[in-house]
Design a protein with these regions (language model features):
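Catalytic binding pocket for nucleotide-activated donors in carbohydrate/polymer assembly enzymes
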Residues: 84-85, 89-141
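Donor nucleotide-activated moiety binding/catalytic core segment of transferases
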Residues: 47-89
């Protein structure tokens, strides 16, 4: 059964821009020097600030730009929660997953993301991991072409059928 996605995601038109979207619910300053040293450009959410520093553009969580940034991202670097990961797959975005420590669901999500060839997982971002991820973007993009993105009708039909069987 495919994931249920919010309508705002289903309405988006995915493009492949230049920026990599970084989304962290808890700021981790240790990743900033790694991102700065990279030749890529990043749009970063989760550091409770806005502004630009070299190749990094900071935006606050809840920004009105978020959905547009997600739709136009070249790739995603984020924790491995189900919602964002599902949205990224729907939009065919390669994903570097940083599962939250001791969160089994996130570790499992990240494991399968990597196993299916849609991205990589790592416990901690390093320059080597980032370089490896960036070098494999075209491989992940090609693999994502085989992902069968669906609207919510299939999932809702399965849920309706299951509820009727239980009643």
């Amino acid at each position: 059964m495919p994931p249920i996605l919010r309508q705002e995601i289903l309405d988006l038109k995915a493009t492949s821009g230049k920026n990599i979207l970084v989304y962290l619910t808890a700021a981790d300053d240790s990743i900033l020097p790694i991102l700065r040293a990279s030749s890529a450009t990043y749009t970063i959410y989760g550091f409770n600030r806005s502004g630009r520093e070299a190749n990094l553009t900071f935006k606050k969580l809840g920004s009105k730009d978020y959905l547009a940034d997600l739709a136009s991202a070249k790739a995603i670097i984020a924790t491995a929660g189900f919602s964002l990961l599902s949205e990224a797959l729907y939009l065919s975005k390669p994903y570097l997953a940083l599962p939250i420590k001791n969160q089994f669901e996130q570790t499992l999500n990240a494991y399968y993301l990597q196993k299916l060839g849609y991205g990589l997982m790592t416990e901690k971002l390093s320059a080597t991991v980032l370089k490896n991820f960036l070098a494999k973007l075209s491989k992940f993009e090609k693999k994502l072409l085989s992902y069968k993105a669906q609207n919510n009708s299939t999932a809702l039909a399965v849920l309706d059928k299951t509820i009727k069987e239980l009643l």
